[in-house]
Structures are given as C-alpha cells and as structure tokens.
Curated annotation (Swiss-Prot):
Role summary: Transcription coactivator that plays a role in the regulation of meristematic function in leaves, stems and inflorescences. May regulate leaf size, length of stem internodes, and seed size by promoting cell expansion. Transcription coactivator that plays a role in the regulation of grain size. Component of a network formed by the microRNA396 (miRNA396), the GRFs and their interacting factors (GIFs) acting in the regulation of meristem function, at least partially through the control of cell proliferation.
Disruption phenotype: Reduced plant height, and short and narrow leaves.
Higher taxonomy: Eukaryota, Viridiplantae, Streptophyta, Embryophyta, Tracheophyta
Keywords in alphabetical order: Activator, Cytoplasm, Nucleus, Transcription, Transcription regulation
Sequence ranges of Low complexity compositional bias: 124-139
Region annotation (Disordered) ranges: 124-160, 188-227
Tissues expressing this chain: Highly expressed in internodes, nodes, developing spikelets and developing anthers. Expressed at low levels in roots and mature glumes.
Compartments reported by the entry: Nucleus; Cytoplasm
Protein name, UniProt field: GRF-interacting factor 1
Species in which this protein is naturally found: Oryza sativa subsp. japonica
Length: 227
C-alpha cells in the first residue's frame, strides 16, 4: 500500500514533466544542472537572508529530485530484462563452445598417449642397439689385440737377435742364428703372432747352444793335437 501511495504521489508530481517513457540522458542531465544551480541559489539566499526565494528554490529542488527518483523507480524492469539477456547469451555461447573445449581437452590426452607409446617402443629397440655397440667394441678390441701381438712379436725378435749376436762370438753361430730366425719368422707369420714369437725364441736359443757346443769341441780337438 505504501509503495502504491508513493507511486501515485510521484505520478502527480510528474504531471508537468515529461513521461518516463520519453526520458533521455540529455533530459536527466538538464535536471541535474538545474538542481546544481538551485542548490547554489539556496545557499546564496540563506547568506543574504532572502527567505521567500530560498523556500521557493527548495520546493523546486525537491520536486526535481522526486521526479528523478520516479525515473529511477521506473527503470529497474528494463535493467532486469537487460541483465537477463546477457545471461541467456552467455549460456548459449557456453553451450556452443563446449564441444571446442572438449576437443581441446582431448588433444593433450592424445598427445600424451602418443608420447607414452613412443616411450614403450624405444626399449624394444634398445637391446638391438646395445648388441650392435657390443659387437663394435669387441671388433675394436680384437683389432687392438692383434696389432699389439704383432708389435710384441717384432720386439721379441729384435731382443733375441741381439742376445744371439752377443753370445755366439763366431761367424758360424751368427749365420746359423740368422738362418733359424728368418726361417722361423716366416713360419710364425703364417701361423700367428704368438706362436711365431715362441718358435723364434726357441730356435734362437737352440742356435746359441749349438754354437757354444761347437766351440767346446773345437777347443778339445786343439788340446789333443798339442799334446
């Protein structure tokens, strides 16, 4: 009842003004400017002691304020309708963009699945790669051992030849040693680095012992002839 009474009072006050349906922002701005001027006039009237003019300006200011209040009361239904429209629009747009969001969410899942499948596929290839690496390492090690064995065979040959040359003391012993060394070196080259070096050392030592025994017999023969 009170609200209806207030609405009737507002309508009575708005009789001499424009109806709320024709209200524009320019009209509201005019009322605000007029109210500002009325307030300044009221203050001036109070300072100068003009009571009648002050009362008249106050009544007009109150009338304008009531009119603006009535306009404000008539606006909420329209604002409510406007507020409902964006909400409906948002709901429709949300329903429209839901498939796109679901597709965007499924895209990372598919990427994760692809990555996991790649991770599981890599260990299947790793044993083959390890085997190839082991074979390559073994082949490299065999080449290194073969080259090392050949080098050691030549060093043994050189050492035994020098020992034989120092211990023989005669041309026959050196010639026998050289013959045995070169012949055994030829055999060792065909049979392998390790076996060749062993046979070379044995033959060289045999040649040295033969040379020493030959020298002993020669000395014994000379002693018997002298006696």
């Amino acid at each position: 009842m009170q609200q209806q009474h207030l609405m009737q009072m507002n309508q009575g006050m708005m009789g001499g003004y424009a109806s709320p349906t024709t209200v524009t922002t320019d009209l509201i701005q005019q009322y605000l400017d007029e109210n500002k001027q009325l307030i300044l006039a009221i203050l001036d009237n109070q300072n100068n002691g003009k009571v009648e003019e002050c009362a008249r300006n106050q009544a007009k200011l109150q009338h304008n304020l009531m009119y603006l209040a009535a306009i404000a009361d008539s606006q909420p239904p329209q604002t409510a309708a406007m507020s409902q429209y964006p909400s409906n629009l948002m709901m429709q747009s949300g329903a429209r963009y839901m498939p796109q969001q679901s597709a965007q969410m499924m895209a990372p899942q598919s990427l994760m699945a692809a990555r996991s499948s790649m991770m599981y596929a890599q260990p299947a290839l790793s044993p083959l790669q390890q085997q190839q690496q082991q074979q390559a390492a073994a082949a490299h090690g065999q080449l290194g051992m073969g080259s090392g064995g050949t080098t050691s065979g030549f060093s043994i040959l050189h050492g035994e030849a020098s020992m034989g040359g120092g211990g023989g003391g005669g041309g026959a012993g050196n010639s026998m040693m050289n013959a045995g060394v070169f012949s055994d070196f030829g055999r060792g080259g065909g049979g392998g680095g390790k076996e060749g070096s062993t046979s070379l050392s044995v033959d060289v030592r045999g040649a040295n012992s033969g040379a020493q025994s030959g020298d002993g017999e020669y000395l014994k023969g000379t002693e018997e002839e002298g006696s």
